[in-house]
């Protein structure tokens, strides 16, 4: 009993002080839990936003994969179209012996180009257009008085777009202004 009295004398707290301490502890605990809740809610929002971004990126990747899946295959077919066009260029349209073969090649080329167009492959034939470095590759420059400088004079190889994206640039010859001709002998005199 004496020990209990000594303990009571050592802790001379009143019940009001004890309740105040408990209230402070509870208030601190509530504040700590509110901070943890806010942090958890913030983390939950960030995770939800990240999931939405991942889902959106995955959808875009799938869309691009579908859109450009034909890129390699279409690129390989362009050599076939080029060969058919060269064959037509080199054959004489007036030669009766090759006329049926020429018509067959023309129909085959038309069928191939129509098929490519159905799959959003667009042919670029820039003859006479202004040079566009985004769609054309200049192979040479040639002086010309017939067209404006910077225009496409000749097309060595047609270019192609797949779904609006450049698959192959057109290989072209670009015009340039003629150099001033040296004065003739008559002009010197």
From Swiss-Prot:
Please provide the record's keywords in A-Z order.
Answer: Chaperone, Cytoplasm, Stress response
Record organism: Stutzerimonas stutzeri (strain A1501)
Question: What NCBIfam families does the annotation carry?
Answer: PRK14139.1, PRK14140.1, PRK14150.1, PRK14151.1
Annotated localization? Cytoplasm
Ranges annotated as biased composition (Polar residues): 7-20
Origin organism lineage: Bacteria, Pseudomonadati, Pseudomonadota, Gammaproteobacteria, Pseudomonadales
Task: Provide the primary localization.
Answer: cytoplasm
Q: Which GO terms describe its biological process?
A: protein folding
Question: Can you state the subunit structure given in the record?
Answer: Homodimer.
Q: Which InterPro entries match?
A: GrpE (IPR000740), GrpE_coiled_coil (IPR013805), GrpE_head (IPR009012)
What is the name attached to this protein's record?
Protein GrpE
Q: Which Pfam families has this protein been placed in?
A: GrpE
Record function comment: Participates actively in the response to hyperosmotic and heat shock by preventing the aggregation of stress-denatured proteins, in association with DnaK and GrpE. It is the nucleotide exchange factor for DnaK and may function as a thermosensor. Unfolded proteins bind initially to DnaJ; upon interaction with the DnaJ-bound protein, DnaK hydrolyzes its bound ATP, resulting in the formation of a stable complex. GrpE releases ADP from DnaK; ATP binding to DnaK triggers the release of the substrate protein, thus completing the reaction cycle.
Q: Which molecular function term from Gene Ontology is one that the record holds?
A: adenyl-nucleotide exchange factor activity
Q: Which GO terms describe its cellular component?
A: cytosol
Region spans: Disordered: 1-21
The UniProt entry's sequence similarity note says: Belongs to the GrpE family.
């Amino acid at each position: 009993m004496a020990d209990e009295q000594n303990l009571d004398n050592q802790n001379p707290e009143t019940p009001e002080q004890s309740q105040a301490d408990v209230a402070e502890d509870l208030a601190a605990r509530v504040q700590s839990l509110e901070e943890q809740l806010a942090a958890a809610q913030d983390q939950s929002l960030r995770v939800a936003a990240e999931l939405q971004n991942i889902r959106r990126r995955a959808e875009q990747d799938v869309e691009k994969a579908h859109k450009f899946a034909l890129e390699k295959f279409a690129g390989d077919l362009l050599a076939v179209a080029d060969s058919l066009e060269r064959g037509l260029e080199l054959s004489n349209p007036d030669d009766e012996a090759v006329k049926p073969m020429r018509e067959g090649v023309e129909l085959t080329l038309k069928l191939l180009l129509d098929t490519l167009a159905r799959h959003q492959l667009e042919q670029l034939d820039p003859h006479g257009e202004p040079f566009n470095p985004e769609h054309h590759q200049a192979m040479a420059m040639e002086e010309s008085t017939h067209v404006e400088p910077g225009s496409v004079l000749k097309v060595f190889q047609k270019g192609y777009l797949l779904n609006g994206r450049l698959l192959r640039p057109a290989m072209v010859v670009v015009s340039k202004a003629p150099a001033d001709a040296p004065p003739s002998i008559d002009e010197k005199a």
